[in-house]
Amino acid sequence: MHFSIGSLFLYLIASASCTAASPQYIQRSRRTPFTTSTSKPSAFTNPSTDTATTPYVLELTKINNKGNARSAVELNSQVRSGSANLVSFAEGVGFATSINIGNQTFEVVIDTGSSDLWVVRDGFICIDPVSRKEVAQSECRFGPAYAPNTTFHEVVGEFVDIKYADGEILSGVIGTENVTLAGITVNQTIGVMDYAGWYGDGVTSGLMGLAYSSLASAYTTNNRQPRLYNPIFATMYEQGLIDPIFSMVMNRNASNGTAAGYLTLGGLPPVDINGNFSTTPILITNIKGYPKDYDFYAVNIDGVALGNRSLPEAAGGIQYIIDSGTTLNYYPTPVADSVNAAFIPPAVYNDYDGAYVVDCNATASVHGVMIGGSTFYINPTDMILPGGMDNSGNKTCISGINAGGDVGQGIFVLGGTFLRNVVAVFDVGAAEMRFAASA
């Protein structure tokens, strides 16, 4: 891949995994306020213990390939266990895992911001997501396609229709199929796509959502009424196969083909933890109209630590989405300005690039995120990220902290910059998240 300085923001969102998608660069002066709401889900179990182990562990690995990001921050551009090998889309942009559907095995993207499990069907129609014109199947860059057999049972009178924030669209049929993930087999409702406008990666054949069932994209054909069903994670815990919890840890030092972390179903990942867990309620943040409603796992934070002082203006009831699909942390703009001004030499925001450009040899100030009474410090390595090459062939770097806009006008995210430093526990049953510093 070749990056000009003008393509930095594309690199942030998709890194080595992007296709020819063309994101609109964030312009601070031209934001449209988002319509959002926040709710706290009801707990239905007691919190799991901080030592809960499980055999259902998915190993994350990294590859260099192309495929766009379906992350929370994509909305800011105003367009949009057992053991299995997982694929990480470069610098924490996304993850994929191996899953058995019927008698076939596929790689699917893991997405904490959606609920559906879907794969593309053989013979599907590929369209350009922008022009909506039919193109060759190879343009969608899917992995192997699903061929339904006798174990797949289509639900008559229902269909699936999905639109992502970056303009991708898919539609197809709904049905049930035997699905095995990390050694656990369930009969699961899935979407089978006949029509796709997709920025693929050449590896994955679909996507697996881990969010709440309210995000399911199934509808009745007669009056287009939403039809809710359990995502695969909920199916597993409602059948008593796992506890209602999943967790994630990322490894910044992973190279291509090596372990980049773990996603664990029903417990904690098999890694060492520094100190104790800090707890905070899960807040479901709903973002309307881009082009559908999006619900994300979100939390409140206590503030941001910078050097020997704290920045309480980062808190005050502001919701931060926990999103492994976003490379950077996105703070309210005044907070991001303060953190980036503390680099030596300072990082400078470039409006065209939508990023703070920083000297690749700069020194980052001590910086941490304060949650649940604890401060989780960011490794300096995660504060300066490669930005490709400029038009003159010079190496460029960008800050791990970006501007998310003014409060009420943007989306704030704790992404890979934060998540590479913690073990993150999504305790859905107790309606809380827990974080501990990773060793």
UniProtKB/Swiss-Prot annotation:
Which CDD domains has this protein been placed in?
A: pepsin_like (cd05471)
Which stretches does UniProt call biased (Low complexity)? 32-45
Q: Which EC number(s) does UniProt give? A: 3.4.23.-
Q: Give the region (Disordered) as residue ranges.
A: 31-50
State where the protein is found: Secreted
Catalytic residues at 111, 323
Q: Which UniProt keywords apply?
A: Aspartyl protease, Glycoprotein, Hydrolase, Protease, Secreted, Signal, Virulence
Q: What does the record list as coiled-coil region(s)? A: none
- Claim: Secreted is one of the keywords in the record: yes
Q: Does the keyword rRNA processing apply?
A: no
Alphabetical list of InterPro entries matching this protein: Aspartic_peptidase_A1, Aspartic_peptidase_AS, Pepsin-like_dom, PEPTIDASE_A1, Peptidase_aspartic_dom_sf
Show which residues constitute the signal peptide. 1-20
Task: Output one GO BP term.
Answer: proteolysis
Give an example GO molecular function.
aspartic-type endopeptidase activity
Q: Name one Pfam family in it.
A: Asp
Its function, per the record, reads: Probable aspartic-type endopeptidase which contributes to virulence.
Indicate the family of this protein. Answer: Belongs to the peptidase A1 family.
The name under which this protein is listed is Probable aspartic-type endopeptidase AFUA_3G01220
